[in-house]
Amino acid sequence: MRHVISILLENEAGALSRVVGLFSQRGYNIDCLTVAPTDDPTLSRCTILTTGEKDEAEQITKQLHKLVCVFRVSALLEEAEGGLERELVLVKLYTPNRSIRDEVKSLADIFHARIIDLNAEIFTLEFVGSSAESDNFIETLGKIVEIQEVVRSGLVGIAKGSHFMKP
């Protein structure tokens, strides 16, 4: 089962290492990790995607609460249940002729992707969506054009509505 855990922690050396170390000590794999400072420069927001049983996710959440460097921990729900998640995808495509370029432009419009760089044979597209939407976008592109390179930012998430994550 897929679990997205959002953590508010100190923005200082070693804090992220302690969080990651906890996962490692318990034998939990991190599928995706995204960290950045918040509007408060003393805090960072860390989003971790992991897979495992529900009780394992609850256990790791309880252990994270015990770390001194951690202020808040929240398990983000699926979008239908009250969570929002997004990731940025950059895809470099080989587009050797006009027919393929036109097809890529049409697909970019359908997926609300943007062409951010192009030359005679290469298009670079930018796409923002959920992990599932990103997977679908990449898979669909791969069926019509040769993908040269894919870069994914990693997952970020936030609760819907009036739920806030503050220390």
Where are these regions (language model features)?
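A conserved regulatory-domain signal marking ACT and ACT-like small-molecule sensing domains
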Residues: M1-P167
